[in-house]
């Protein structure tokens, strides 16, 4: 049977690239004396996409943001913590400048600037690390130090961290080597006592020892996709000296260690400096005075502290800062819920007294910014449950009484009738 063209000729048409006839493909696109099928078009698109992927890292390297630009971007998403943002901006800039220009400059070897973030729960440590990675468009992964153990023990090996990073970038080693790793709860792997113990501390000092080489820089052999189930597969070699490690922790009790040191240095007897009650130093001010010896006394081993040369301290968030966090950043919590309600065609309004009540509640719980979402979620739960079943609601108003649990959110209907969510 002969294929017929629309112009009436009996010539069978073939793709000029793969040679398939017009009956073997879905579409054959004609050009001047040539034809290309839909399959070859798809293949060309794949080739172009791969080329773009390879070119992208070079483009990024040529446009490294300055510390000012990094700090400015952090300001859009993180409220307060000005000193910490400045320290991070400089450290991150220097790290990627080192990668871009090679580890040496005129024969001088440039050291690696891993970062230690010290601050209470909910002060923004994780958010800072996530925002940095997103801005720089580099792979990012998080690990919880409390789940890590030495190799050979029940728990997560430290090298699993690199495996997670590889998973985030589809096992592209070059891309992973430009990534950021955030290790949370690093204070929880402190040594149980000041003196090294004869018994093995596999989740404390043992983990610190295991992390040493990884953080400083080593070539880690990581199993490819499929892991240890396929031992015949060749391991991927990842150079961790190019990965930026950021460690964070609350370090509860560290302020007491610092206070003890500063009190001792102040002297005793007639030469002692007497401090009045009005001169009482805050916890944040104490943490800002942290020295390596304080961290050693807290339980981190000297070698581990040496691998984290850049230290930034974060202050406990005040009530005013929590109110700002609720509505000022680009992805502020209230803006997120307003966008969610907007998908239902409903306007969501948070009154000023409601924001204050949310902040007060979070302060009472001592959870910092981390506790804000659960408070808002609790206040809006019933409304979010009922709203998709109601067609005429135009606006939902949240006030102080709603946050306190004394009343339901105010629902404003299309006919401009205000009713309580309870159905009054």
UniProtKB/Swiss-Prot annotation:
InterPro entries documented for this protein: AAA+_ATPase, ATP-dep_Clp_protease_ClpX, ATPase_AAA_core, Clp_ATPase_C, Clp_protease_ATP-bd_su_ClpX, ClpX_bact, P-loop_NTPase, Znf_CppX_C4
Gene3D superfamilies, per database record: 1.10.8.60, ClpX chaperone, C4-type zinc finger domain, P-loop containing nucleotide triphosphate hydrolases
Binding site for Zn(2+): 15, 18, 37, 40
Gene Ontology BP terms: cell division; proteolysis involved in protein catabolic process
Keywords recorded for this protein, A-Z: ATP-binding, Chaperone, Metal-binding, Nucleotide-binding, Zinc
Residue intervals of the ClpX-type ZB domain: 2-56
Pfam families per UniProt: AAA_2, ClpB_D2-small, zf-C4_ClpX
Residues given in the record as ATP binding sites: 120-127
Family of this protein: Belongs to the ClpX chaperone family.
Subunit structure: Component of the ClpX-ClpP complex. Forms a hexameric ring that, in the presence of ATP, binds to fourteen ClpP subunits assembled into a disk-like structure with a central cavity, resembling the structure of eukaryotic proteasomes.
Protein name: ATP-dependent Clp protease ATP-binding subunit ClpX
Lineage summary: Bacteria, Pseudomonadati, Pseudomonadota, Gammaproteobacteria, Enterobacterales
């Amino acid at each position: 049977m002969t294929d017929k063209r629309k112009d009436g000729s009996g010539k069978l048409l073939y793709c000029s690239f793969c040679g398939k006839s017009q009956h073997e493909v879905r579409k054959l696109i004609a050009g001047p004396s040539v034809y290309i099928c839909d399959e070859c078009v798809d293949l060309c698109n794949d080739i172009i996409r791969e080329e773009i992927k390879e070119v992208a890292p070079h483009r990024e390297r040529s446009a490294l943001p300055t510390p000012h630009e990094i700090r400015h971007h952090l300001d859009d998403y993180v409220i307060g913590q000005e000193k910490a943002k400045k320290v991070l901006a400089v450290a991150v800039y220097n790290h990627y400048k080192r990668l871009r220009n090679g580890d040496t400059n005129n024969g001088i070897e440039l050291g690696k600037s891993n970062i230690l973030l010290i601050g209470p729960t909910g002060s923004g440590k994780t958010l800072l690390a996530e925002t940095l990675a997103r801005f720089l468009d580099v792979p990012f992964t998080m690990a919880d130090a409390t789940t890590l153990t030495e190799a050979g023990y029940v728990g997560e090996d430290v090298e699993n961290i690199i495996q997670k990073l590889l998973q985030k970038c589809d096992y592209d080693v070059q891309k992973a080597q430009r990534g950021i790793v955030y290790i949370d709860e690093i204070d929880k792997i402190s040594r149980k006592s000041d003196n090294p113990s004869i018994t093995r501390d596999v989740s404390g000092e043992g983990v610190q020892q295991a992390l040493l080489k990884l953080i400083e820089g080593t070539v880690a052999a990581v199993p490819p996709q499929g892991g240890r189930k396929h031992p015949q597969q060749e391991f991927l070699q990842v150079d961790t000296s190019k990965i930026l490690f950021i460690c964070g922790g609350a370090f509860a009790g560290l302020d007491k260690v610092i206070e003890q040191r500063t009190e001792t240095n102040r002297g005793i007897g007639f030469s002692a400096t007497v401090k009045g009650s009005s001169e009482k130093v805050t916890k944040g001010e104490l943490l800002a005075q942290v020295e390596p010896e304080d961290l050693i006394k807290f339980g981190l081993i000297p070698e581990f502290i040496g691998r984290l040369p850049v230290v930034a301290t974060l202050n406990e968030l005040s009530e005013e800062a929590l109110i700002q966090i609720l509505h000022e950043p680009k992805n502020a919590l209230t803006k997120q819920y307003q966008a969610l309600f907007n998908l239902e065609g409903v306007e969501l309004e948070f009154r000023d007294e409601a924001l204050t009540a949310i902040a007060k509640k979070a302060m009472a719980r001592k959870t910092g910014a981390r506790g804000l979402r659960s408070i808002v979620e609790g206040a809006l739960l019933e409304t979010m449950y009922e709203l998709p079943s109601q067609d005429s609601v135009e606006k939902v108003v949240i006030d102080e009484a709603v946050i306190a649990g004394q009343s339901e959110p105010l629902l404003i209907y299309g006919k401009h009738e205000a009713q309580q969510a309870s159905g009054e």
